[in-house]
Each structure stands twice: as C-alpha cells, then as structure tokens.
Amino acid sequence: MSVVYKKKKRNVVVGVVYIHATYNNIIVTVTDQQGHSLICTSAGACGFKGSKKATPYAAQETASHAVKTVVEQNGMKTVSIKVSGPGAGRESAIRAVQACNLNVTSIKDTTKLPHNGCKLPGRRRV
C-alpha cells in the first residue's frame, strides 16, 4: 500500500518572489520569509519549449502562474521581489507579479558580477 504525503496548507501573508532569468529559461520561486519554498516553476514547466522559454511572454506567464497559485493556496498579500540573471524576461516578470494585486514592498537586483574573475569563453565561429 502506498502512502500519500500532503503538504499542510499554512497561511503565509508575507513572502519573497525570486526570479532567476537566464538566456535560455526563467525560474520563479515563491518562499515565505524564512526561505521555505511554497512553489517553484519554470517556463518549461508552464508548457513553453525550446527558444520560446527565453521570451518575455513566457516569463510573464510563469510569474503570474506561480503568484496566483500561492495567493489561492496560502493567502499571500505582501511580497518583496529579488531578481537575478541577465535574461530577457526580467521586467515582464516583475510587472506580472505587480499585476496580481499584491503589495510589493521592494524590488532588488541580486545578479552576481565578477570582479575580473575567470576568462570568458571565446566567440562562436560558424
């Protein structure tokens, strides 16, 4: 007999939305203030395949899907947004979170920049 584990639904009013936008995909994670993950989605998980995952529309749909799910399940009202990565869908994902009737307290860019670290890969020759 198999055992089914269900996550307890808990009321989380304040949370953090992490948006990681790369050149190929976008990953949106919604956590509570302690860092416990409530939902994690990507553009590929929302049905986008190939080069369509890197579009601003895919970022908008992924962010709105994640936030709407958390609002329905946990009753979230206030979020702070942390964005990282150089991807194309950064601004559209932020706008999608703001459009979900949430109180956005802060927007922070947490992209890591090297202080002249490793040598970059060479230019592609086709």
Swiss-Prot record:
Transmembrane: is it a keyword of this entry?
no
Keywords of the record: Ribonucleoprotein, Ribosomal protein, RNA-binding, rRNA-binding
A GO CC annotation recorded here is: ribosome
Output the Gene3D superfamilies linked to this UniProt entry.
Answer: Ribosomal protein S11 (3.30.420.80)
Q: Which GO terms describe its molecular function?
A: rRNA binding; structural constituent of ribosome
Biological process (GO), any one: translation
Q: How does it assemble?
A: Part of the 30S ribosomal subunit. Interacts with proteins S7 and S18. Binds to IF-3.
The entry's family comment says:
Belongs to the universal ribosomal protein uS11 family.
State the protein's purpose. Located on the platform of the 30S subunit, it bridges several disparate RNA helices of the 16S rRNA. Forms part of the Shine-Dalgarno cleft in the 70S ribosome.
Q: What is this protein called?
A: Small ribosomal subunit protein uS11
Name its species.
Ehrlichia chaffeensis (strain ATCC CRL-10679 / Arkansas)
